[in-house]
Amino acid sequence: MGDTAALLALEAKEVYTIEPDRALFEKAEIRFHGNPSIHVIHGLSENILPSLLPTLSGTVNFWLDGDFSGGITHQGPTDCPVREELLNIENNLARYDKVTVLIDDIRCFDPYVPEYADYPDLNFLVDWARKNNLHWHIEHDIFVAKSKNQPQANL
């Protein structure tokens, strides 16, 4: 756990990682102790983002991977908080010069499969990107939506 945050910290000035599970949060805190560019926050993303997002500006990238997928991943009030996460991002888009939203595990966004019933379908994500004037595509197992003034990047 924490590999994505560590990788992002190689390129970004600051990385905020939100971990709802207490044990995983504590492991991440230990792992990133002494790294001033990685901020580990304990809580549910849908509760943390409303106060965190207004503090950000400039070029902002979001890696959304807070869905419950079994194993040690956290199961919150919903298996997939992406609807609330995207609403929070949408409410703050005007603050950012450029934005990229990456949503992992796109294969799970099929609510007709019983174990993914809490997930929105792909059309929800596409409509959200279009409504917010973002270019979107799928690469590997990741839905990518970003400001139209950004070059295409390979994941």
Where are these regions (language model features)?
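Short, well-ordered coil/turn elements that cap or connect secondary structure elements
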Residues: L10-A12, H33-N35, S57, R95-Y96, ...
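Short, conserved active-site loop motifs that form the nucleotide-linked donor/cofactor pocket
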Residues: I38-H39, V60, V99
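C-terminal substrate-binding/active-site "lid" region of AdoMet-derived donor-dependent transferases
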Residues: F68-N154
